[in-house]
């Protein structure tokens, strides 16, 4: 796969040298893009990322589209100054269906691996959830701009929202993704953590 193709249209690459090493290895890579179906339609930003995922797909890599049906019910706190309204399971499923319809206008549906994070989170015990919290500290979470601002201004941050970045990072551990692509949001870089 041509390095220039991968780098084109990207603004920030975290671990650029590692990415280039993975691409030049010739190994088939698992490339993940996750979306939480919190509304009926995808955004223009999603379109850009789907095109990048398609480039990896066309180069023979595994394109993994993660539907964050579990995390959509929580709601991504990134950039929010208040708690997101909770969605029902039915709303999330309706939104997910339209997301897939829209995504497959770009991606090859036969070559796209669709996963839902409810597959693992619905099976997780409370003890497992608590054990997951050992991976990050409160101080690390408060480094996130969105949480920091809300904390300093005495605005509520629910425990569910506080766990969201950890939950989202765990998706990548479960999927064993080599590469993650996403819509530009520097606040979300805290949603990723390394496998141990």
At which residue positions do the language-model features occur?
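NTP-dependent nucleotidyl-transfer catalytic core
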Residues: 1-195
